[in-house]
Amino acid sequence: MPAGLPTQMTVRECAEAVIAAQRCHGAEPAAFLAAIEEPIAALLERNDLRGVGIPRQGNNVDWSQYLYFDGDLSFLLFEVPEGGRVQPHDHGVWELFAVYRGRMRHTVYRRTDDGSVAGYAKLAATDDRVMRAGEAAIVAPPADIHGFCALDGGAMGLTVVSGQYKPDRHYYDPEANSYVVKRAANLR
């Protein structure tokens, strides 16, 4: 690219930064998030992400695209209609959740019961906030449950996931201290 022209973060460059940060900080969610905050923010500044990816069958949303996939790491762009709510659920792997467009209420939970009673789960919120475009959160053990709701029409999110989702996922009702198990439509 000629000197002096602005450059955009490419999806590949962002993926390379995430891979490097995962090697250095993978077991420490706060350090990992700090290391990838700048490249993720630069990627989220792009106005063309909706046209970059390829279609993906979503697990919790109707519209989802792969922006990047290498067999382990995936970047997923998705849309949630205004008022659309994704029930609290787990993944079995860490996930970065970021807002690309609009605002979303995002809550991260950790499970506080011992898991010994089928269908019963007591959750405690560890991060509950309204996130705006450009903001990100890590959903990782032991706080590896999250749910979200779109507060604006056209709200879009980006998730970065390493590994496969577990096939049988828990979908929680925090008010009723309960969960149901559902089979994931897509493990990646």
Model-inferred region functions:
Residues 158, 168-188:
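Extended, aromatic/histidine-rich regions of cofactor-dependent oxidoreductases associated
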Residues 93-110:
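Glycine- and acidic-residue-biased ligand/ion/polar-headgroup-sensing regions
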Residues 1-46:
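N-terminal leader/capping segments at the start of a protein or of a new domain
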